[in-house]
Amino acid sequence: MSLRGFLGALISASLVSACGGGNDEPSGHSQPDAGGEDASDASAADAGDDGSIDDASVPDAPADAPVDTDATTACGTASECALADEQRASDKMDSIVNDPTALGQFLTAVPKGGDLHNHLSGAVWAETYLGWAKSEGNYCITNSSLALSTSCGNTSTTSPVPTAADSLWLPVIRAWSMQDFVAGAETGHDHFFATFGKFGAISGSAHHAKGLADVMQRADSENALYLEPMLFSNSTAGNVGSAVWSGGTLTTAALPGFHAALLAYSGWNAAVQAIVTDITNTESGARQELGCDGSSPDSACRVGSRYMVYISRSGSGPAVFAQMVAAFEAAKIEPRLVALNLVGPEDGSTALSAYDRQMEMLGYLHTAYAGKSPLHVTLHAGEITTKYLPTSYNIANINHIRKAVEVAHAERIGHGVDVLGESNPTELLYELQQLGVMVEIGLSSNTQILEVDGTNHPLATYLQYEVPVALATDDQGVSRSSMAGEYMRAVQDQKLDYKTLKLMARTSLEKAFLPGPSLWTSFEALEAVTECAPTASSYYGEDPAPAACQTYLDTSDKAAMQWELERRFREFEAKQ
C-alpha cells in the first residue's frame, strides 16, 4: 500500500463525532509495527472518545491521473473550468460524507495549506518516541509513572523500553497520549497535560531535528504545504532574567529599566544566539534526516517551515520577560524565527494570576520593537472553560482573548474556545473580524482537554461573524490525530462543507507568518495582484505560472506558497 493509501486507511472510519479507534502511527516512516493489544488489532467498534485514528483496511488510491488545464475545453474560460472542477469536488464530498472510508481518503488528499498551531514535542507519536529510545539504548521506563528516564540502574523500579510485542507497550502509549482514554478520577484535561512529562526525556532539543523531519513527512503525506511549529524554549535567557532582576515583583513600570539591563548583561548575546543555533541545528538536522540535499530527497523536503519560540506561562516574571526579549532580539538576525507564543494550561494558578502582567509585557515590547524586530505574536487565549476554572474566578471577567488582542497585540489566537464567555462577545467577534485576527482551531484537543465539541464549539460562530479561522493539529501525537483527522472532525462534528474547508486552507497561508506580500489584493473577493490575475486562458494555480506572475512570485515566499496551494487545488479538483 502506498503511503497516501496507508494514511487514507488510517483516517477512514475515524473521528465520527468525537469517536476514534485505532492506535497506529499515521506515518509509515519511523514507526515499529504495533502488535499484541496495539491499535493494529483495534476495530471501529472499539472506538472511544480519545480522538484516535482508526486503521481501516482500504485499497490503494489509483495512481494520479494527468491534469488537463487546457482552457479551451467545453467548460469555457480557464476560470469557468476551474470553478466547475471545484463544484465537482464539492459534490463528490457531499456524496461520500456518510462513508467514512471514502471520506477519509478524500480528506487525506485535499490540499491543506499550513498547520499554524503545532507543538513539536506533542506532535511526535508515542510509538516514534519509543522507537528512538529503544534504538539509542540509554533509556528505561519508570514503573510507577510510566515516564521515560535515563536513570536506569535500579531494575526493581524500572523496566526496559518496550517493543510492540511487550505487555508494557500499550500501557506506555496510553500514558503518553489520549489513546483509549476514558475520564474517571483523572480528567482528559489533566491526562493530556500530564503526557508531556512522560516523554520529556526524549522530546528536547537533542531530538528536535528528528521530530521536525517526522512531522514534515506526515504533513507531506496529507498534502499540507507549510508548518509553523513551536520548537524552542530558551532557558538560557530565562536564567539571565532571573539573575539580572533582584527587585521583587516585576511591575510594568519597571520593564524599560529591566529591558535595558538585560541588553547590557555580559551573557545576553549568548542567550540570544542560543535561539539561532537551535533553529540552525534543527533545520539542518531535519534536512539531513530527509536527504534533502542528496540525490533522492524525501518528498517531505518540499514542506515549508518557519519557527516559533515558546515560553511557559508558569515561569517567574523576570524569566518570562527575558525570554520574550530574547525572541524579539533573535528575530532581528534570524529570519526563520517568525513568532513567539505562551504555552501551558491557561487555567493554571500562575497562568491566571500572571496573565494580565504577561500581556502588558508583550504590549510594552510591541512598542519598544516597532520597526526594529519583525517578530510576530500569536497567543493561546480562550483555551478555558468554567469546568476547569478555579471557583475564585468569574469566567465573564477573564477576557483572555480580548486582552491578548488589545493589550499584547496578538495577530493570531490559539483555540479561542471561550469567546462567547467573554464580556460583550459580539463586540469582540466584530473586533476580531475587523482586525483580521485569525483563530487557530484545534478540534481534537478542544474535545479532549475541554470537552467542547459539536454545537458547543464556537467554530460556527466564528464563521458566522467572518472571523478568519484555520484548522490546526495542536499536539497530534498526544491527540492521536493529524491534519486529515482535524478535517474529518470538521466535516463530521462541525458539518463543514468542501468550500469552507478550502477557504480555511487558503486562510492558513494568508495568515501565515511567511515573508513577502500576499498573492491576493482582496482575499475576501479572491482577487489577485495584477501580475497573477486570471485571463481567458489562465487561472490561479496555472503550472507553469504566467511569466509576469512568476516574476512576482519570485519576490514573495508567501505568494509563492499561495500559488502552489492553488496549483494543488486545481490538480486535486480536476481528478474528482
Q: How does the language model describe each region?
A:
Residues 7-10, 22-24, 30, 37-38, ...:
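Compositionally biased, intrinsically disordered low-complexity regions
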Residues 1-17:
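Sec-dependent bacterial lipoprotein signal peptides
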Residues 5, 30-32, 296:
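Positively charged, low-complexity intrinsically disordered regions
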